[in-house]
Amino acid sequence: MSRYRGPRLKKIRRLGALLGLTRKTPKSGSNPKKKFHSGKKEQYRIRLQEKQKLRFHYGLTERQLLRYVYIAGKAKRSTGQVLLQLLEMRLDNILFRLGMASTIPGARQLVNHRHILVNGRIVNIPSFRCKPRDIITTKDNQRSKGLVQNSIASSDPGKLPKHLTIDTLEYKGLVNKILDRKWVGLKINELLVVEY
């Protein structure tokens, strides 16, 4: 299954707030289908919704998500927490968390168009797994700095997670450590995703 490129607000209305998907918010009371879906939710439906939240928030395909669940399952720690740590340490997500991109799809585009350097080397793979003490910068040209500057100016510095630091003057971010579960910005039950 390929990456979702359709209307994003429909997904937000169905699954709830997905901060990485878009900055737009749906109008209140604009979902006429909500009336018909009242009643008891089945276990399968709950698990499917949690999985879809994770997929659409991080912009993953079904195969990528299965691969991350497989890697997390091999770890000795809690599978759900390892899964979230793997997803949060992706380069596109770290750019979004630093405020260098307004959304995760925007961060993917920055990486794909070769505007981002990790430890002084160009990386054009959005799923690149960052490690502690990685330094993330932009290219020295004006175009790359301009793209990041707009996003940094509009981002809220109070929402920066504790495992990241950013230097807004030099457009440089640093990964300090691996993320704790409490700093994940998504309200999700990761155990239901693993069970699915």
UniProtKB/Swiss-Prot annotation:
Domain S4 RNA-binding: start-end pairs: 89-169
Protein family according to the UniProt entry: Belongs to the universal ribosomal protein uS4 family.
Gene name tied to this protein: rps4
Official protein name in the record: Small ribosomal subunit protein uS4c
GO molecular function: rRNA binding; structural constituent of ribosome
Record function comment: One of the primary rRNA binding proteins, it binds directly to 16S rRNA where it nucleates assembly of the body of the 30S subunit. With S5 and S12 plays an important role in translational accuracy.
Species in which this protein is naturally found: Melica altissima
SUPFAM superfamilies per record: Alpha-L RNA-binding motif
UniProt entry tagged with the keyword Methyltransferase: no
Self-association state and partner proteins as the record states: Part of the 30S ribosomal subunit. Contacts protein S5. The interaction surface between S4 and S5 is involved in control of translational fidelity.
